[in-house]
UniProtKB/Swiss-Prot annotation:
GO cellular component terms given for this protein: cytoplasm
Location, primary (coarse class): cytoplasm
Pathway: Amino-acid biosynthesis; L-histidine biosynthesis; L-histidine from 5-phospho-alpha-D-ribose 1-diphosphate: step 2/9
Protein name listed in UniProt: Phosphoribosyl-ATP pyrophosphatase
HAMAP family per record: HisE
Molecular functions per Gene Ontology: ATP binding; phosphoribosyl-ATP diphosphatase activity
Cross-referenced Pfam families: PRA-PH (PF01503)
Key words of the record: Amino-acid biosynthesis, ATP-binding, Cytoplasm, Histidine biosynthesis, Hydrolase, Nucleotide-binding
Naturally occurring in which organism (per UniProt): Methylobacterium radiotolerans (strain ATCC 27329 / DSM 1819 / JCM 2831 / NBRC 15690 / NCIMB 10815 / 0-1)
UniProt enzyme class: hydrolase
């Protein structure tokens, strides 16, 4: 198992955020605004879902990596820190999913 973490990925995105969009895909995505990052995340998520349904494990692995990368880019673009997302996941795992969903306020 690799030691590479989502925190490592977030640090990489942060380090490339202010670089030249002509030489960094991350900087290019960020320079085009959150809508572009959101669109790419959606595309990659659909591709991951298709790979899963087709039983394509290699495709699913590769598309899942793309989903995680584009999610971290979108979080950066939206000003949301990965630590905040992880804290929310930790909070949610402290109770059952059914109890957590029941405790949500109606939209």
């Amino acid at each position: 198992m690799t030691a590479y973490t989502l925190a490592d990925l977030a640090a990489l995105v942060a380090s490339r955020a202010g670089t030249d969009p002509a030489t960094s895909y991350t900087a290019k995505l960020l320079s085009e605004g959150p809508a572009k990052a959101a669109k790419k995340l959606g595309e990659e998520a659909v591709e991951a879902a298709i790979a899963a349904v087709q039983g394509d494990k290699t495709g699913l692995r590769n598309e899942a990596a793309d989903v995680l990368y584009h999610l971290v880019v979108l979080l950066w673009a939206g000003g949301v820190e990965l630590d905040a997302v992880m804290a929310e996941l930790e909070r949610r795992t402290a109770q059952s999913g059914i109890a957590e969903k029941a405790a949500r306020r109606p939209a």
